[in-house]
């Protein structure tokens, strides 16, 4: 597949492999990626607009400084995927497996993570303007220097997240989740 054209509009890519390629400054408008598997792929300074990724294995892919606007990732494997320094505007992640995914230094605007496994994912120094997490799994997920103020995590499974006390100031959780945050506040509970 040749993505090195300047602008790809209304293209569909299905049942294919992408191996050992770097794509630079390509624009993807209203494209569909269905059942695509990647290995050693890098997208640098690319723009994805109204694009859908369905049942793709994008594990270990690198999206370097990319812009995603009105994009959906549906039932995708994003194991170890690197989105660092990218921007998300009206992006939806549905039922995605995001173990070890790197969202560091991303700028999120109206981003939804819906039923995603974000275990050991990294959201370091991430801006989360109107970011929502619904029914996500967050085990050892890192939110260092990523303020969670007014972010609702009440429907998520949370265990041993990594964050500074100021990062969790104002986070919205339910009563049962409070024990997952005690260690962040340096509070000790005396056992019975």
Residue ranges of model-derived segments:
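Tandem repeat scaffolds
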Residues: 1-192
């Amino acid at each position: 597949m040749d993505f090195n054209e300047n602008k790809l509009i209304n293209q569909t890519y299905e049942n294919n492999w992408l191996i050992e390629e770097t794509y630079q400054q390509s624009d993807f408008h209203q494209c569909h990626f269905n059942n695509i598997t990647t290995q050693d792929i890098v997208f640098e300074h690319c723009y994805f607009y109204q694009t859908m990724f369905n049942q793709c294995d994008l594990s270990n892919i690198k999206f370097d400084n990319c812009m995603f606007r009105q994009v959906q990732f549906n039932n995708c494997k994003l194991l170890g995927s690197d989105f660092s320094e990218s921007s998300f505007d009206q992006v939806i992640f549905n039922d995605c497996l995001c173990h070890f995914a790197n969202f560091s230094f991303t700028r999120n605007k109206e981003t939804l993570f819906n039923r995603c496994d974000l275990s050991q994912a990294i959201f370091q120094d991430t801006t989360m303007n109107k970011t929502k997490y619904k029914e996500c799994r967050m085990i050892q997920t890192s939110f260092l220097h990523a303020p969670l103020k007014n972010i609702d995590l009440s429907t998520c499974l949370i265990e041993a997240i990594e964050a500074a006390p100021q990062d969790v100031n104002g986070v919205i959780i339910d009563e049962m989740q409070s024990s997952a945050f005690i260690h962040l506040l340096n509070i000790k509970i005396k056992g019975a």
